Amino acid sequence: MENLDIAKFGGTSVGNFDAMTSSYKVVVGNKNSRIVVISACSGVTNLLVELASGKCSDSKINEIIEKLRDIHEQIIIHLENQHELRNYIEGHLKEIKEQTLLANKGTNDQLTDSIVSHGELMSSYLFVALFKHYGTDAQWFDVRSVMRTDSKFSCAKPICEEIKVLAHDKLLPLINDKTIIITQGFIGSNTLGETTTLGRGGSDYTAALLGEALGVATITTTINWGKWIINIS
């Protein structure tokens, strides 16, 4: 699709309010950027992986949950609608804790994927709020509705034909000149609707898969303020 670019940001580029603001400026600086794919905030995935290991004591679980809360709170305090944003994050933290307690009874790759997926879901939601904070219309989109994969949890294989059909059906109609679509890297879902992940570093893969499905002009990946352009033919 002509005049449609995807911007992808890694964890350090959305790790705090200032980093998110810099990433926001990159997006709005390119009038063709209509879709943004982001990772979890820096450090969050590692914390979630630790919880998913099934080896955390109750005190360690509480300690990590508090770290996760603080990472996101340091972004929320700069935004509007703080009560609603905190409720959203707290909902995820509650689910993370419940899933962690299940992992302590016996973990597996499917449960791990469910736990680690919360990172991208939280960061992308706050990124939408940041866009609105700066007066730019943005819409949150759950990439799992189009990122169809097999059921090999922790390193799922994308089903490109289905991704293309789903992206054209569910994502493409949302794209316009006024709204930025914010979505998640790394995560997907199988045919049963169960959450899967593409493996560590999967956010770049997500952007490439969406780009291929939609035939975008370019994908811009920004990591630590360095920029690479990947052309999709």
Give residue ranges: language-model regions.
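Nucleotide/pyrophosphate-binding catalytic subdomain
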Residues: 1-233
